UniProtKB/Swiss-Prot annotation:
It comes from Salmonella typhimurium (strain LT2 / SGSC1412 / ATCC 700720). InterPro entries: CedA-like_sf, Cell_div_activator_CedA. NCBIfam families: PRK10113.1. GO terms for biological process: cell division. Belongs to the CedA family. Keywords: Cell cycle, Cell division, DNA-binding. This is Cell division activator CedA. GO terms for molecular function: DNA binding. The keyword Kinase does not apply.
Length: 80
């Protein structure tokens, strides 16, 4: 007799994908900068453009990450 492929009474977990690359749960938001998060010891900016986030490269100083975010906002003409 073959075993069933999955446990019969186990609930199926529904997965809702996030809009990537959104700031992950373990990222720490910097209060002094609008778009800058601390991620693995580096500074990363996340900018919401239309329906998706754009993620910056990792910077060693938060000002650089914010400058990148400001440029992306200007390029996409995001209104506040």
């Amino acid at each position: 007799m073959m075993k069933p492929l999955r446990q019969q009474n186990r609930q199926i977990i529904s997965y809702i994908p996030r809009v990537e690359p959104a700031p992950p749960e373990h990222a720490i938001k910097m209060d002094t900068f609008r778009d800058v998060w601390i991620l693995r010891g580096k500074y990363v900016a996340f900018v919401l453009t239309r329906e998706s986030f754009q993620r910056s490269p990792a910077f060693s100083v938060p000002e650089s990450a914010q400058r990148w975010a400001n440029q992306v906002r200007q390029e996409n003409e995001i209104a506040d």
